Amino acid sequence: MGKSEYSEDALIQAPTAEFLHQELGWDSVLAQDEGPLVAEGLLGRTADTQVVLTRDVLAALRRLNPGLPEAAYTQALEAVVQNDSTKTLVQMNQEKYRLLRDGVLVKFRDAPGTGTGQMVEKRLRLIDFDQPGRNRFLAVRELWVRGPLHLRRPDLIGYVNGLPLVFIELKRFEVHVDSAYKQNYRDYLDTIPHLFHWNALVVISNGHDAQYGSITATKEHFYRWKRLDEDDPEPGPAQPLLPLLLQGMLDQRRLLDIVENFVLFDATEDGVQKIVARNHQYLGVNRVMARLTSETQR
């Protein structure tokens, strides 16, 4: 590892992972320690092309949808890892988003002695959006991912129940945040596109400035998250924005809320655009919903 890489890891990557772990309750691993790619390994990957952590997905399927035949879980996992090369990245992302929100439809026969023995259709949940504690949030640093032609190592991937929902590219303080977008993120979209099939948020930061967007967003449509509450003051010019973004978007309950309720696929003349709500929209809508809930409970 060169000096610049060491500095980037020591000054930005490691503290970001530590913040997710200590402040927001995420598990955190350094993929340099992954070791042999075997099912019993650190992440359960058996090939460096794999971006979905199937061991965690299966564990979540069993945990959130208990009492079903094993064939139901296996069928759901097959749908999760399925990759259709005839579809665009945006089409795949929209398809996976439906599975994320609505669950995976499976068909299976009732187990003998527990049902009628008939074929049953059921949607299996991949995530418990109501109880964050029933999900596994895992930050993985420096995971090697192999694409059709290239091998890449993203800085940090945020997994929920084995699904790579968050991509974070980090630069040193003195490097402009645009570099993370132009030199790294755009390259990863081209060289390891399957990493983004499940992506919900793209985050770029140099430790001070921090911005987020969707997989279809141009750099002009990456935004900052400056407030945790509508009444919070505007952060000063010397205040680092990365901790605010992490708290505002990657707090476990907030992340699930954003993924479930604040993502939109919009068909435009230029194609389908994926839109993630901006800071003020998220806070404003939730304030209205809280007020309505309070009024109905009186």
Model segments located where?
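ATP-dependent helicase/translocase motor core
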Residues: G2-R298
